[in-house]
Amino acid sequence: MPLQVIEPTLEDYSGHCHALVVSLVRATAGSPVDLWSGEGSGAMAFGPDVTIHPLFRRRLRPLQMLRLLHRLLRRSGRIVVTTARTRDLALLALAAPGRIPPDRVFLYFHWVRETPGKLRFFRAIARRQPDIVILGTTESVVDVFRRCGFQHVALLPYPAPETMPSTEAQPFRRLLYAGAARQDKGFGIVVDLVELLAARNEQVPITVQVTPDHYGKYDAATRADIARLEAVRYPPLALIRQTPTPAEYAANFPGSICLQPYDRAEFRDRVSGVTLDALAHGCPVITTAGTWNAAMIEPFGAGIALAGPDAESLRAAAATLRADYARFRDGAFAAARARGRESWAALLARLRR
């Protein structure tokens, strides 16, 4: 029976969803997979073992998810929701014909915003469906579910991409902002940096991705920042206006310094696929201290974590990394290798039972 993998937001090759599914398919090593994904994913390819079901539309997603779970829970086979949300627990409780047995349904939570109301909800679901397997990216995520009474909770660090040893010799080429243009990812600070570089007549190459989020939208602040960026006269600036293919996206990292001045409150315990992609390609990272990103780079000397990133501190940190790029690049590869050894182990152990 194929493994039933559900990733409703997977629409194309952008974002973390694609890399996550690729990593899981690689880890399951030839086992058949039914992939239930967004309606725009039909033309994607994950290899001969994966059957794509392009099902989900954004506005209908909760209802479609409920119907899908209702159907799958009445068949044999295991179900993995690779990017789980609180709502998925409620839908499972509604869809299940009875108590879900152990090792049947796996929900992978990347982060949890802990509130009193959410904790009460988790406790209620744990009493009703204690055998749902909860996987979490960090200790603090899994601790929430353990405290709420779920009996099968495991740490599964966010899977790392394969490292790219052929890029180890790349010298510094440019600064890079990769991923969707978003305020919580410090896009405005990166625009401030470009303005500063232009004002000081510097010639440091910088590439900035200005594509929207999964839903093709920008908020007002980001639109204003893009307008500012387009108005800057800085010849070494290159803009990525279209969502890159996987190959194009990967090619951005070797020789780059990845700028991630992410919001500390939002990313204190929230995984960044861009960080993992950067490290896999030997790309050092500049990020915000006290974030998940910082915890990935600091033990390995894979970049610099800033207490309060702004344009001036980004510029100074970039100069430090450029001056000793080979050492920081090696640290990035070391961080990626350490992360890769942990990928999917907690899930695979249960699937083999």
What label would you give each PLM region?
Residues W111-V112, S140-V141, L155-P165, P212-H214:
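Short beta-strand->alpha-helix junction loop in the catalytic core
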Residues G15-H16, G308-A316, R322-R352:
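A charged, aromatic-enriched C-terminal amphipathic alpha-helix characteristic of glycosyltransferases
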Residues Q129, A220-A250, I257:
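Nucleotide-activated donor-binding/catalytic signature segment of Leloir-type glycosyltransferases, i.e.
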